[in-house]
């Protein structure tokens, strides 16, 4: 049984939390995030520590308790440190370019794919085959990186495509001739 919800969240220096009727706003050096949480979970701030309390031990309350704590912790980490996902491109002629806030990908199609950066997300290109997606919201960073990856997922025969750095792609044998 997970006990994530019972863990205390420690506010780093420079991070402020405001709770107005379970609409929580977290401000930090990298920005500000706001999210509405369930009214069943009580959020208490004591100095630099945040604790969450549930009214009873029903299964539904336990799941909401753990989820709320994880989301709140991600907000605190996001505004203080930020999140990033790295993607790598493998394939002949596969490359990426930046045009303002737009990411332009050449991934073996007849046309280039363009990805507009959502609000709060930045794209970086350390080299033409590596893409770094960064921002303060873990959810939006993950969704944006997953969308970029979905434009050309790694295929199992040659491994060509866009993958997360360190991702293992299972390879298959090709057909054998007679």
From Swiss-Prot:
One of its GO terms (biological process) is cytoplasmic translation. GO terms for molecular function: rRNA binding; structural constituent of ribosome. InterPro entries: Ribosomal_uL6-like (IPR000702), Ribosomal_uL6-like_a/b-dom_sf (IPR036789), Ribosomal_uL6_a/b-dom (IPR020040), Ribosomal_uL6_bac-type (IPR019906), Ribosomal_uL6_CS (IPR002358). Keywords: Ribonucleoprotein, Ribosomal protein, RNA-binding, rRNA-binding. It holds the Pfam family Ribosomal_L6. Disulfide bonds: none annotated. GO terms for cellular component: cytosolic large ribosomal subunit. Part of the 50S ribosomal subunit. This protein binds to the 23S rRNA, and is important in its secondary structure. It is located near the subunit interface in the base of the L7/L12 stalk, and near the tRNA binding site of the peptidyltransferase center. Belongs to the universal ribosomal protein uL6 family. This is Large ribosomal subunit protein uL6. It comes from Streptococcus pneumoniae (strain ATCC 700669 / Spain 23F-1). The lineage of its organism: Bacteria, Bacillati, Bacillota, Bacilli, Lactobacillales. The gene is rplF.
């Amino acid at each position: 049984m997970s006990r994530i919800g019972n863990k205390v969240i420690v506010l780093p220096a420079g991070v402020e939390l405001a709770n107005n009727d379970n609409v929580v706003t977290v401000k930090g050096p990298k920005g500000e995030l706001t999210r509405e949480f369930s009214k069943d979970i009580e959020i208490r701030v004591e100095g630099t520590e945040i604790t969450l309390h549930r009214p009873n031990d029903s299964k539904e309350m336990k799941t909401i308790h753990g989820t709320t704590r994880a989301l709140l912790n991600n907000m605190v980490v996001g505004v203080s440190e930020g999140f990033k996902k790295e993607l790598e491109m493998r394939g002949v002629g596969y490359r990426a370019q930046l045009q303002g806030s737009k990411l332009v990908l050449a991934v073996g199609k007849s046309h280039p794919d363009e990805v507009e950066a959502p609000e709060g997300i930045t794209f970086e290109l350390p080299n033409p085959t590596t893409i770094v997606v960064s921002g303060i919201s873990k959810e939006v960073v993950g969704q944006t990186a997953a969308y970029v990856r979905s434009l050309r997922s790694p295929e199992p025969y040659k491994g060509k495509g866009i993958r997360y750095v360190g991702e293992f792609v299972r390879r298959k044998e090709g057909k054998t001739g007679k």
